[in-house]
Design a protein with these regions (language model features):
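N-terminal capping segments
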Residues: 22-125, 129
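Glycine-rich, aromatic-bearing surface loops/beta-hairpins
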Residues: 200-207
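Bacterial Sec-dependent N-terminal signal peptides
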Residues: 1-25
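...with weaker cross-activation on analogous glycine-rich loops/strands in unrelated enzymes
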Residues: 126-196
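Conserved active-site beta-strand-loop modules that form the wall/rim of enzyme catalytic pockets
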Residues: 6, 116, 162-164
Length: 207
């Protein structure tokens, strides 16, 4: 079953593995927002508890209400534990702060641990477009090609509060709009070479 949560799919813009760009060291200094991790198993149990408590009233919730519950659970309970986890192109870790994790595995592991039934390994190894179109209904996918980062950020802001999967030519991650700031959350080789939560407008990868 495909997800009903909005997603933005970015294609044909600067990808994280482009080798022909000269990278300025200053631009690689992405800001990383580190949250204090709590027991990850407890996090997943908390997600399950949220779902159980919401089960009775879930059918009565609006689409927007369901999106907010899902977004809050993922962005504020699951993801903070992963910030700082080391990146590796072949990383397949299932535990935050242990081993390494690649960008695709970061996305699919977070979604799985948030309670979604998905093929974690298969989707993580797909191109980001294939992963997104497998998970998301077409009407919720928006494509951007060769647009200025300011245009993209404005589109996210207009969309409102939410957590979005973003796919580039050779990279994937989450865009999180908390209504005050738009963040790019991803496992990347750029800068600190780990899972980062950075200001999307300042992200070298998105530019």
């Amino acid at each position: 079953m495909k997800l009903f949560f909005p997603v933005f799919l970015l294609l044909s813009i600067n990808a994280c593995h482009q080798k022909n760009k000269q990278v300025n060291a200053a631009r690689l200094a992405a800001t990383t927002f580190v949250s204090t991790p709590i027991n990850y198993d407890s996090c997943k149990k908390q997600i399950l508890l949220i779902k159980q408590k919401s089960k009775i009233s879930w059918a009565a919730l609006s689409k927007e209400g369901k999106e907010k519950i899902f977004t809050r659970a993922v962005a504020e309970t699951i993801i903070p534990n992963w910030i700082g986890t080391k990146w590796d192109y072949n990383g397949i870790s299932e535990k935050p702060q242990q081993g390494n994790i690649a960008c695709g595995y970061f996305v699919t592991t977070v979604l799985r641990d948030a309670g979604l039934n998905l093929a974690r390994i298969k989707l993580a190894q797909c191109a980001s477009e294939q992963m997104i179109t497998t998970l998301i209904q077409p009407k919720y996918i928006r494509r951007f090609s060769n647009v200025d980062i300011a245009v993209f950020i404005q589109a996210i802001q207009q969309q409102g509060y939410g957590l979005y999967i973003v796919g580039l030519d050779n990279h994937t991650g989450f865009i999180y709009n908390d209504n005050s700031q738009v963040y790019f959350i991803h496992s990347t080789f750029v800068g600190t070479r780990n899972v980062q939560k950075e200001n999307a407008a300042a992200s070298w990868v998105l530019k």
